[in-house]
């Protein structure tokens, strides 16, 4: 053997910093402690002088009598343990301070290579025979002596002689001296169906044999797939996974020169029964992975590129590699788990775009009754919300403490848990819910067919606002055109950027309270989707601000509340209040049912698609003229509702495109900026002389205040 192979082998064994981590030998259970139930058995003392969990792993790894360790995430303490969760008289317990790391060889139920390192607790052979204890010489005599190093414990299957067939044991049957235990290799223990998004096996090597980097580490390769942000992707330890919709499972490698590689995993046979994705053709549910309709343009009306073509855009999403994703012709699809169906476009300057013009399938349950007016006189017995959630009794104080009770509202007949409208909510009867995450929701009711909804009131003579809707003069508007089509660089301190788990901008929003953002329902796959890893960015004009920009505030999203049916609105509650300053300000909410007079000049702001009119870097602001719904409906053939409003560009084409959705239509009224509309997907964005449609915020102001009041 030459000196170079020896050097490479030596550096691998020593675990050179920046390559292999000692944590690679461990599986982690977050927020978990391992207790031993026998008081006479005590774990090792806490060691408080460790830098991180990697140092703990470096201490535990070489010790034969260390099989696991606790890592205290707050004090950075380390406690070495001589047992695992499979040891007798132990139990797992949830913990708010500790993570539990256990050596893979002791907790894996499959084997790597020929299983020489297997230290599991399988104790029966492939033929079902009990194993003989290694310390016994009867009924079958043998030469092996149990030690800590060879791991010949109890009567567990082991492979002390490196048998190619894997772990084995002597049996308790005098007629069968020894037999294989038939433990599957980790490669064979779990198979891949479709593109392997649901693969949760324990293979931690790539197809070239390189060891995988742990998902919870950022070396040797930095990446966005932090396990704490992608809770639904199974990013366990350093096992092969597919969190980004690649053609098959992969991992980052411990080789600094090779960032990532695919893993060699067997495909499932026809007998495997994968989770069936519900398919739809006229609408889409969730993120639209099951959409199989024929929409073939983007929200902006740009034709889609065929999936089997590589012009004008080269890509990896070919029908052959994604056979189960139905990548037919140029239809909108979602092969990679994006926020909604999308496609590559035929426009060379626009690589890909979403197809938000496809409507979402409603998840409301079928109405069980009807009501007149606002439903204040409804006295029926419906007791479920529009989502099918059971109503809380009006007399109960859990899970929500009610503000309206039979005592406080004797005329509202707040009986049992029946839907009522004690506060005159304009969106109909409602109730407190039995879901701890949802204080209240509207009920499974519809307006009666013979009931005419009230028309929007005339605008009041005076609108007064005091502490919101103020800003410093915008930046020089003559510099350039930007991403709102026909727009200019500007300051819109209430406009926020919604960021997904990879930190990418996907929608806009408006700061209406220090802890609340108003945005569009179309930006989210579900009203109950996991929000871990989603953030709101405020205080910057740049789509990709520099690291450490002093005015940037990044706040995690804690909660989502979907608006009344048909509103297309969502309120996001932040984990903490933002700090208001010149770069971060509240925008005023309009009075209820306020109608912006035609001819009013308003502005939209965002970081969305520009159709080639500008660069990617700065917040865009564009002016638009408000027009009446009557004029708007001439072009839109009567489809614009009173809960919507319209604008037409002052300089065609001017308007909102993809990436701007959820952002504000702000109008300057009585020396204040007022949030009059929310940008929603239009059939074609920024089309010359074609009215753009927005959700009219004033129709839903009572709901906004109610949600913020109830928290």
UniProtKB/Swiss-Prot annotation:
Signal peptide (from-to): 1-18
Domain of life: Eukaryota
PTM annotation, UniProt: Cleaved after Arg-483, probably by HPN/Hepsin, to yield the active form consisting of two disulfide-linked chains.
One Gene Ontology cellular component annotation held by this UniProt entry: extracellular region
Pfam families in UniProt: Kringle, PAN_1, Trypsin
Location of this chain's protein in the cell: Secreted
Glycosylation, residue list: 72, 296, 615
Keyword annotations of the record: Disulfide bond, Glycoprotein, Kringle, Repeat, Secreted, Serine protease homolog, Signal
All copies of domain Peptidase S1, residue ranges: 484-709
Phenotype upon changing residue 689 to C: May be associated with inflammatory bowel disease; results in reduced binding affinity to MST1R
CDD domains registered for this protein in UniProt: KR (cd00108), PAN_AP_HGF (cd01099), Tryp_SPc (cd00190)
Record-linked SMART domains: KR, PAN_AP, Tryp_SPc
Domain PAN intervals: 21-105
GO molecular function: receptor tyrosine kinase binding
InterPro entries named in the record: HGF/MST1, Kringle, Kringle-like, Kringle_CS, Kringle_sf, MSP_HGFL, Pan_app, Peptidase_S1_PA
Subunit and partners: Dimer of an alpha chain and a beta chain linked by a disulfide bond. Interacts (via beta chain) with MST1R (via SEMA domain).
Recorded family membership: Belongs to the peptidase S1 family. Plasminogen subfamily.
Protein name: Hepatocyte growth factor-like protein
Organism of origin: Homo sapiens (Human)
């Amino acid at each position: 053997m030459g000196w170079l192979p020896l050097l490479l082998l030596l550096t691998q064994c020593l675990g050179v910093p920046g390559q292999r981590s000692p944590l690679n030998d461990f599986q982690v259970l977050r927020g978990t402690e391992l207790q031993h139930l026998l008081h006479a058995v005590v774990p090792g003392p806490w060691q408080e002088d460790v830098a991180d969990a990697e140092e703990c792993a470096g201490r535990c790894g070489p010790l034969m009598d260390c099989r696991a360790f606790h890592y205290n995430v707050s004090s950075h303490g380390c406690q070495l343990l001589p047992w695992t969760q499979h040891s007798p008289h132990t139990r797992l317990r949830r913990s708010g301070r500790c993570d539990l790391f256990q050596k893979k060889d002791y907790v894996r139920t499959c084997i790597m290579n020929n299983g020489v390192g297997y230290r599991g607790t399988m104790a029966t052979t492939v033929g079902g025979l009990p194993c003989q204890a290694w310390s016994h010489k009867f009924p079958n005599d043998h030469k092996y002596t149990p030690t800590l190093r060879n791991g010949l414990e109890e009567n567990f299957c082991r492979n002390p002689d490196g048998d190619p067939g894997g772990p084995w044991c002597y049996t308790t049957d005098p007629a069968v001296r020894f037999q294989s235990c038939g433990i599957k290799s980790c490669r064979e223990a779990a198979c891949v169906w479709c593109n392997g998004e649901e693969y949760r096996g324990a293979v931690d090597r790539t197809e070239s044999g390189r060891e995988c980097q742990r998902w919870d580490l950022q070396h040797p390769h930095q990446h966005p797939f932090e396990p704490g942000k992608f809770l639904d992707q199974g990013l366990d330890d350093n096992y092969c996974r597919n969190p980004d919709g690649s053609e098959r499972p992969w991992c980052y490698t411990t080789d600094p020169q090779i960032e990532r590689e695919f893993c060699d995993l067997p495909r499932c046979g026809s007998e495997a029964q994968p989770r069936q994705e519900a398919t739809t053709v006229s609408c889409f549910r969730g993120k639209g992975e099951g959409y199989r309709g024929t929409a073939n343009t983007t929200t902006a009306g740009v034709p889609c590129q065929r999936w089997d073509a590589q012009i004008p855009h080269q890509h990896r999403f070919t029908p052959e590699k994604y056979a189960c994703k139905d990548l037919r012709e140029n239809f909108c699809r979602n092969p990679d788990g994006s926020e909604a169906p999308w496609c590559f476009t035929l426009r060379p300057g626009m690589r890909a775009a979403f197809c938000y013009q496809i409507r979402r399938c409603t998840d409301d349950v079928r109405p069980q009754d009807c009501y007149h007016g606002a439903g204040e006189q409804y006295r029926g017995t419906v007791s479920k919300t529009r989502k099918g959630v059971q109503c809380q009794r009006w007399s109960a104080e859990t899970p929500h403490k009610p503000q309206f009770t039979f005592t406080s509202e004797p005329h509202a007949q707040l009986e049992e848990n029946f839907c009522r409208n004690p506060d005159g909510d304009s969106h109909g009867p409602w109730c407190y819910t039995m879901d701890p995450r949802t204080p209240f929701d509207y009920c499974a009711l519809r307006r009666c067919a013979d009931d005419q909804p009230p028309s929007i009131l005339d605008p009041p003579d005076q609108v007064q606002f005091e502490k919101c809707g103020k800003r410093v003069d915008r930046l020089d508007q003559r510099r350039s055109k930007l991403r709102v089509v026909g727009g200019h660089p500007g300051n819109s301190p209430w406009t926020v950027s919604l960021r997904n788990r990879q930190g990418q901008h996907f929608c806009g929003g408006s700061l209406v309270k220090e802890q609340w953002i108003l945005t569009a329902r179309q930006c989210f796959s579900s009203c109950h989707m996991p929000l871990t890893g989603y953030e709101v960015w405020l205080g910057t004009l740049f789509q990709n601000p520099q690291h450490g920009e002093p005015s940037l505030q990044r706040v995690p999203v804690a909660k989502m509340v979907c608006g009344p049916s048909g509103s297309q609105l969502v309120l996001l509650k932040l984990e903490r209040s933002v700090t208001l300053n010149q770069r971060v300000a509240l925008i005023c909410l309009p009075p209820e049912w306020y109608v912006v007079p035609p001819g009013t000049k308003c502005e939209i702001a965002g970081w969305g698609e520009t159709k080639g009119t500008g660069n990617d870097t700065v917040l865009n602001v564009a002016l638009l003229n408000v027009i009446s719904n009557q004029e708007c409906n001439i072009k839109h053939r009567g489809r614009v509702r009173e809960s919507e409003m319209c604008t037409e560009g002052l300089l065609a084409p001017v308007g909102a495109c993809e990436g701007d959705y959820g952002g504000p239509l702000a109008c300057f009224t009585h020396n204040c900026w007022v949030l009059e509309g929310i940008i929603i997907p239009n059939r074609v964005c920024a089309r010359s002389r074609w009215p753009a449609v927005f959700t009219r915020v004033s129709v839903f102001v009572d709901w906004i205040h109610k949600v913020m009041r109830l928290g």
